[in-house]
Amino acid sequence: MNNFRNLINQSIRNYSTTTNVATKTKVYELKTYNILANNIPSFFELLGENKGSNSLGTWVTEMGSSNQVISLVEHESLDDRQMNEWNTKFQSKAAKLIEKQESLILREFPWAPFQKISNEKSNENKVWELRTYQSKPGKLGQWAIDFTTGFAERKKISEPVGVFYSEFGPLNTIVHLWPYKSFEDRFRIRDLALKNPVWVETVAKTTANLDSMESKTIIPVKL
């Protein structure tokens, strides 16, 4: 664990625009709900009625998986999550609508702090991409070091709202959340990024430390 933290800190030093290397105890919870198609409207209604102030966004899957609702929640700490009365009340009401649910507890990489999703950003970006990577055991820190070598170049084209790694749930998991104006906008931006030699080299280095990758396109939902 100490070696992992040392590698994360090294990735911070490599990323020249980062000034604050302190890591807070704040965590993010990525919730994935599998809902029967005819239950989705009722689930959205219930989610809207019980929306907590720490909810950062809700999406429904379009490609990659079907009938999934994705929710991102912020917790000042895991202890706050444990004491959150909303969590208990919502779960008891929603249980009959949910086939399966998963919860992934995430922390943000210090060089990619989460960017709040404003109404304007949500309205402008109709298509979002949730990218999930599984790093090889013991290679997450090295992945972070390699990724930061090209992240500044990639941000010149477009930025994710967050880059996270898992604390609880499947370990060695990396999560990116990218906003796009449309599907064509996504193709255009990714094609442009792959013409940048720095980013191409970064992709080659980072993929060497990964076991798997998954992409879901998700559509924002207004509750």
From Swiss-Prot:
Highest taxon of the lineage: Eukaryota
Biological process, per Gene Ontology: mitophagy
Annotated Gene Ontology cellular component terms: mitochondrion
Pfam families linked to this entry: NIPSNAP (PF07978)
Family: Belongs to the NipSnap family.
Xref: PANTHER family: NIPSNAP-RELATED, PROTEIN NIPSNAP
Protein name: Protein NipSnap homolog
Organism classification: Eukaryota, Amoebozoa, Evosea, Eumycetozoa, Dictyostelia
